[in-house]
């Protein structure tokens, strides 16, 4: 609505700071990468949750303890719901998806999971597998549409987002011509955010009587069903090995130091729908985290 109004009035509405704080990503997607079909955007888009997950990994702390620490340091709000439930990252991936597809993406249509269920035990399993748990916001091109999701994921050490820690953000972009690119930097804080805001003000002043084109039409994009996307899944359960194999078939069992009285395993790659069908056959599932 605001973009259309700006075009009508021959002025500009810019919002670089809305995603990634001081990281330039809106302008690159809107201008530098317009020759590409953007096939994937995957990002760590919330500094608060990234700080919390980093601290849980380094110290072995539980969620409640790192949340209090983040609040004491001013990284998390008194009501942290938007951050820890993934809503902030969801709105940001909706903005980026709208930019690359040129249509309106409703964040309410994006499947979103936060980090409130992540525990110190999950971190132990991730470390045993040589992985790190990150809250990822992902959008992938599926046919003529996109599929978007926000959820915690286990990343291997070779993934470009694996070393992104603390309050930093990073956005991985794959284009059909460009290939892979990554944008990294301070995703929050008054000075990084001010840098992006002032840059927009300078851009507006430079093009005072010209409307800079931005392809974002009001027509709503119907997102592809996330349940058709494939992943591997890490699962913790109280069930025994026979029950696990009966439900999921071939799996890779994982042992974590200091964890007893349960099983951890990684499934073969399958759709979300297939996982849900198999999980319904297994009692006492304690946790599920997607594995990249």
Residue positions per predicted region:
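Oxidoreductase and adenylate-handling cofactor-binding alpha/beta cores
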Residues: 25-38, 49-61, 91-105, 200
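Substrate-binding/catalytic subdomain of NAD(P)-dependent oxidoreductase enzymes
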Residues: 67-170, 189
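A conserved regulatory-domain signal marking ACT and ACT-like small-molecule sensing domains
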Residues: 201-292
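Electropositive phosphate-/nucleotide-binding environments in soluble metabolic enzymes
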Residues: 19, 23, 35, 46, ...
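Catalytic, metal-anchored helix/loop core of enzyme active sites in primary metabolism
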Residues: 40-42, 50-53, 57, 69, ...
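Rossmann-fold NAD(P)-binding glycine/threonine-rich loop
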Residues: 1-31
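A generic structural signal for well-ordered alpha-helical segments
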Residues: 6, 70, 126, 245-248, ...
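General beta-strand structural signal in soluble alpha/beta enzymes
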Residues: 13-17, 40-43, 135
């Amino acid at each position: 609505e605001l973009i259309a109004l700006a075009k009508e009035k021959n002025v500009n509405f810019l919002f670089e700071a809305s995603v990634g704080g001081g990281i330039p990503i809106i302008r690159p997607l809107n201008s530098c990468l317009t020759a590409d079909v953007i096939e994937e955007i995957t990002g760590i888009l919330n500094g608060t949750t990234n700080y919390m997950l980093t601290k849980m990994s380094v110290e072995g702390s539980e969620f409640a303890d790192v949340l209090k620490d983040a609040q004491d340091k001013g990284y998390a709000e008194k009501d942290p719901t938007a951050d820890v439930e993934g809503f902030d990252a969801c709105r940001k991936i909706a903005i980026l998806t709208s930019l690359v597809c040129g249509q309106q993406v409703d964040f309410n249509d994006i499947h979103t999971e936060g980090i409130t269920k992540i525990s110190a035990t999950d971190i132990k399993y991730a470390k045993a597998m040589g992985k790190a748990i990150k809250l990822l916001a992902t959008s992938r091109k599926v046919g003529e549409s996109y599929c978007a999701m926000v959820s915690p994921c286990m990343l291997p050490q070779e993934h470009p987002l694996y070393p992104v820690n603390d309050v930093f953000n990073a956005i991985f972009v794959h284009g059909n011509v460009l290939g892979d690119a990554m944008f990294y930097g301070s995703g929050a804080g008054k000075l990084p955010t001010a840098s992006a805001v002032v840059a927009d003000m300078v851009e507006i002043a430079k093009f005072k009587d010209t409307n800079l084109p931005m392809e974002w039409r009001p027509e709503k994009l119907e997102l592809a069903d996330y349940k058709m996307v494939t992943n591997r899944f890490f699962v913790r359960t109280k069930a025994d090995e026979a029950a696990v194999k009966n439900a999921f078939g071939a799996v890779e069992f994982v042992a974590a130091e200091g964890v007893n009285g349960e099983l951890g395993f990684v499934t073969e790659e399958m759709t979300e729908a297939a996982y849900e069908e198999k999980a319904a056959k297994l009692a006492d599932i304690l946790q599920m985290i997607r594995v990249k």
